[in-house]
UniProtKB/Swiss-Prot annotation:
The lineage of its organism: Bacteria, Bacillati, Bacillota, Bacilli, Bacillales. Key component of the proton channel; it plays a direct role in the translocation of protons across the membrane. This is ATP synthase subunit a. Gene3D superfamilies: ATP synthase, F0 complex, subunit A. Disulfide bonds: none annotated. It is found in: Cell membrane. Keywords: ATP synthesis, Cell membrane, CF(0), Hydrogen ion transport, Ion transport, Membrane, Transmembrane, Transmembrane helix, Transport. It comes from Listeria monocytogenes serotype 4b (strain CLIP80459). GO terms for biological process: proton motive force-driven plasma membrane ATP synthesis. The gene is atpB. HAMAP family: ATP_synth_a_bact. GO terms for cellular component: plasma membrane; proton-transporting ATP synthase complex.
Length: 238
């Protein structure tokens, strides 16, 4: 199923306007959630404050399961941002898809491998940055690529490449597959008679609910693996 997207060319580089739009929408939604949930903070949290504190505690648990809080506390905001951004991005394309003149404008940005691989490269880049910053270049390089044995260096390089690919493509594959199946179901419903169409709505809603679950799980997995990779780079025992 070939899809077309609106693009704009700058300096010979094509930019996907759909991705730009959806990433912007995702950022705005996450920002609004953060602002709304942190307004008028109370000592005894209720409602929306409970939600944001639950997210913070959830990410804290992810970090504590991979490294001590003294080391990992600085990545708390990163984890919260990744979890919320990816979850919201995964949800945007589930209710509907908008296409104008056969060009798709509205869908989940994480259904594009360029977006997910960019996220993965950013995350792996941060792990290297903090590894060097916290351990020093020599200690980091030797400990990461030549430990426990020097002949493992080529395999360590392959591992870095594989981690980037799997982190990005896992997220893309799950979200893209979910949206493709929802599109197929919606197309089939449009060609059914009213009675059969009403009955077919039930499995469509069930699949949409399952897709929400998958989107949440993928946001968790991406955040968890980010902290796993980070702990490998910044902790001496790894």
């Amino acid at each position: 199923m070939e899809e077309e997207f609106p693009t704009i060319s700058l300096l010979g580089i094509d930019f996907n306007l759909s991705n730009i739009l959806m990433i912007t929408v995702t950022c705005v939604i996450v920002l609004l959630i953060a602002i709304i949930c942190t307004r008028n903070l109370q000592r005894r949290p209720t409602g929306k404050q409970n939600f944001i504190e639950w997210v913070m505690d959830f990410v804290r648990g992810i970090i504590n399961s991979n490294m001590d809080w003294k080391t990992g506390g600085r990545f708390h905001v990163l984890g919260i941002t990744l979890l919320m951004f990816i979850f919201v991005a995964n949800m945007l394309g589930l209710p509907f898809q908008i296409a104008i003149n056969d060009e798709v404008w509205w869908r989940s940005p994480t259904a594009d491998p360029i977006v997910t691989l960019t996220l993965a490269i950013m995350v792996l880049g941060l792990t290297h940055y903090y590894g060097i910053k916290m351990r020093g270049f020599k200690h980091y390089f030797v400990g990461t690529y030549f430990s426990p044995m020097k002949f493992l260096f080529p395999l360590k390089l392959v591992e870095e490449f594989a981690n980037t690919l799997t982190l990005g493509l896992r997220l893309y594959g799950n979200i893209f597959a979910g949206e493709v199946l929802l599109t197929i179901i919606a197309t089939q419903l449009a060609h059914m008679n009213i009675f059969v169409g009403v009955l077919a709505i039930i499995p469509a809603l069930l699949w949409q609910g399952f897709s929400i679950f998958i989107g949440a799980i993928q946001a968790y997995i991406f955040t968890m693996l980010t902290m796993v990779y980070m702990s490998h780079k910044v902790s001496d025992e790894h």
